[in-house]
């Protein structure tokens, strides 16, 4: 529908190649997805010189992307925004010769607020590379909101500036 604004980012910021599982039971759910690691991924060229590693924040962004998709899959209409997380632990890394990143996200709460046109999802995530757990993220939060998209880029307009979102 025309009001459907939720979408994945375009490559190279898209951190997901496929969704293997998605489910919901009440306010809880689960989403499992993967991304194939490529030797020539853009971030290996610049992070870091002579020591290529995927930035950990891109793994966190992948979790936010998937939680946003979960909201859309549940019927949320609007534009998705990452709203934060309570904890992030990195205890491994992603290198150019690794094969697959796997996201396992347990949605601990999904709330649709139809009066305001908002949906919120909160999830706990485990990120694995080639089967080894390397990141844990607690309470990653994404909201889907109506009437915040900036669809006339690059022109200045009512929504062309950032700053704090209205409460």
List each language-model region with its residue ranges:
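Short, structured beta-strand/loop micro-motifs enriched in basic residues and often containing a Trp
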Residues: 82-87, 117
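Non-catalytic linker/capping segments at the edges of enzyme domains
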Residues: 1-53, 73, 78, 91-95, ...
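Short nucleic-acid-contacting surface segments enriched for D/E, G, S/T with interspersed K/R
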Residues: 59, 94-102
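Compact, glycine-rich, soluble single-domain proteins
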Residues: 63-66
């Amino acid at each position: 529908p025309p009001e459907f604004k939720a979408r994945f980012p375009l490559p190279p910021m898209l951190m997901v190649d496929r969704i293997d599982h998605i489910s919901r039971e009440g306010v809880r759910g689960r989403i499992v997805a993967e991304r194939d690691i490529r030797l020539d991924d853009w971030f290996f060229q610049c992070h870091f010189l002579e020591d290529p590693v995927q930035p950990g924040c891109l793994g966190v962004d992948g979790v936010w992307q998937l939680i946003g998709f979960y909201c859309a899959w549940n019927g949320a209409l609007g534009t998705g925004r990452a709203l934060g997380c309570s904890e992030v632990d990195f205890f491994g890394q992603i290198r150019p010769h690794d094969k697959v990143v796997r996201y396992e996200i347990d949605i601990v709460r999904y709330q649709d607020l139809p009066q305001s046109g908002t949906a919120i999802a909160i999830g706990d995530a485990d990120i694995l590379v080639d089967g080894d757990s390397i990141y844990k993220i607690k309470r990653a939060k994404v909201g889907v909101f109506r009437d915040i998209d900036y669809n006339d880029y690059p022109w200045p307009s009512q929504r062309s500036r950032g700053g704090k979102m209205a409460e």
